[in-house]
Amino acid sequence: MRQLCIILCLAAAPAWAGWTSVAEATGTRTYADPATIKRHGDVAAMWWVRDYQDFQRMVEVGYFSHKTLAEYDCRQMRSRGLSTSLHEGHMGEGKAIYADETAHDWEEIVPETEGEALWKVACG
């Protein structure tokens, strides 16, 4: 019976249970998912999500979260987005109202920013 309770509790856990809060600003919180880190030499890839307290508007639709797969150059302290989507629900849940799977150019990471916090998680 105890095992059944544990299984049911784990199954009921929210989909965002693995997210780790890494940065916070007025009305937003940014989370990284360390379980998604994939390393290839000096480059690490990881999913992260920015969750908005208030509904954000884009033309005629809106969203509560922004989910991104990014690559991090652990040696040169830079990053680039590989895939981004905007979601109707919090924590990257719900319908994606926008998606872009374009690999963007590498950008230097600015110290003491959300980007640096994410880079530290991805690169250890």
What role is predicted for each listed range?
Residues 15-124:
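N-terminal secretory-pathway/extracellular module detecting exported/lumenal segments
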Residues 4-13:
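Sec-dependent N-terminal signal peptides
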